[in-house]
């Protein structure tokens, strides 16, 4: 059974604006990278501030490493010393990088010799050795965040809290930085509570993911489960599932659900449901296979083959995204090479195949 280092129950924080953070239950396993994702203004940063006691909660409990940090009978200063925070904006002081790195040690009256090996490890891994004598003002945004990360990790915190640390860094630096510091986190086994509005980042870095919307946790679980099996429409849309089709369960047989979309279109999915129930079928764009000719569909064993017409072709970077009218709107990813090979353009009539096992029903 996983060892939960952080458990939050019935946590509430009301603001004068009317916004209410209301967390029924949320947890983080020891040594995991947990990422909380949600739109701007959903309460992500507020939760970080509450965990680190930068804000006071109205009610509830935050049990960290066996102690309720909201219980003032506990030594809150000692509990906070087990944590470290890296914010969206780098917080550095007008002195050398070296002095900034040692700030935590000096505030705690700890001898540098106790952490010398860790210091050398971090400046080597994060490529800070040649920056130690410089002022933070002369560093790039990515370099400043690396200094903040090294300072946070120097004291080997029990948990590292990240408040969107890559939000203001360019894409190239973000990818380099992400690779460096998450390699270190995994190597050191540091429990990490990371917040972001970037779902792609969450998919890359996380072990577990939570989705927050309007101050409430909508879903929490292993990242594959959250991204592939969302519990509701809010989560589905936020994790990037654009094709959400409403229908009625028409039949159930051998764990295959037959869903009537409009009486003439049917969708087949693997799962369990109840006949007559209104459900939502979620189809991820990467699970759609595009076929140009009807005769090529005869060799397919998939239950779902939809005839449609391409309404739009959008460039998303690595892929093109097709918007297809199949009697319902269907999104699909496809490469430039496949578009050219199949001779596809706006107005092309095609067939879209989706395995029943790839369709999630809720």
What are these regions (language model features)?
Residues 154-158:
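A short, proline-enriched helix->beta-strand linker immediately N-terminal to the Walker B motif
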Residues 52:
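Helix-to-loop junction immediately C-terminal to a conserved catalytic motif
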Residues 264-313, 333-362:
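Glycine/charge-rich catalytic "coupling/switch" loops of P-loop NTPases
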Residues 60-71, 79, 118:
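Conserved ABC transporter NBD signature motif
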Residues 135-139, 143:
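Conserved ABC ATPase signature
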Residues 37-39:
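The feature captures the beta-strand-to-loop junction immediately N-terminal to the Walker
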Residues 113-131, 182-183:
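Conserved ABC ATPase "signature" region
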């Amino acid at each position: 059974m996983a060892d939960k280092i952080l458990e939050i129950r019935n946590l509430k924080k009301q603001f004068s604006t009317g916004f209410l953070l209301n967390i029924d239950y949320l947890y983080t396993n020891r040594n995991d990278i947990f990422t909380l994702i949600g739109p701007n203004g959903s309460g992500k940063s507020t939760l970080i501030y509450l965990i680190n006691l930068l804000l006071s909660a109205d009610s509830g409990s935050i049990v960290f490493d066996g102690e309720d940090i909201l219980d003032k009978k506990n030594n809150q200063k000692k509990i906070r010393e087990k944590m470290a925070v890296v914010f969206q904006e780098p917080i550095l002081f007008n002195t050398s990088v070296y002095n900034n790195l040692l700030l935590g040690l000096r505030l705690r009256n700890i001898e540098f010799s106790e952490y010398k090996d860790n210091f050398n490890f971090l400046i080597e891994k994060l490529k800070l050795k040649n920056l130690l004598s410089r002022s933070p003002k002369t560093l790039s945004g990515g370099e400043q965040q690396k200094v903040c990360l090294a300072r946070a990790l120097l004291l080997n915190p029990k948990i590292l809290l990240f408040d969107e640390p890559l939000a203001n860094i360019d894409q190239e630096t973000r990818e380099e930085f992400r690779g460096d510091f998450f390699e270190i986190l995994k190597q050191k086994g540091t429990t990490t509570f990371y917040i972001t509005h970037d779902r792609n980042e969450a998919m890359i870095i996380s072990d577990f993911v939570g989705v927050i919307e309007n101050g409430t946790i909508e879903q929490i679980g292993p990242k594959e489960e959250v991204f592939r099996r969302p519990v509701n429409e809010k989560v589905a849309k936020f994790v990037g599932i654009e094709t959400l089709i409403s229908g009625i369960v028409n039949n159930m047989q051998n764990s295959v659900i037959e869903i009537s979309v409009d009486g003439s279109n049917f969708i087949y999915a693997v799962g369990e449901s109840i006949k007559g129930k209104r459900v939502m079928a979620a189809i991820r764009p990467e699970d759609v296979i595009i076929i140009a000719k009807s005769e090529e569909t005869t060799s397919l064993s998939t239950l779902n083959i939809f005839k449609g017409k391409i309404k739009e072709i959008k460039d998303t970077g690595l892929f093109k995204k097709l918007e297809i009218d199949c009697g319902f709107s269907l999104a699909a990813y496809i490469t430039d090479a496949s578009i050219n090979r199949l001779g596809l353009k706006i107005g092309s009539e095609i067939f879209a195949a989706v395995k029943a096992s790839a369709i999630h029903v809720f």
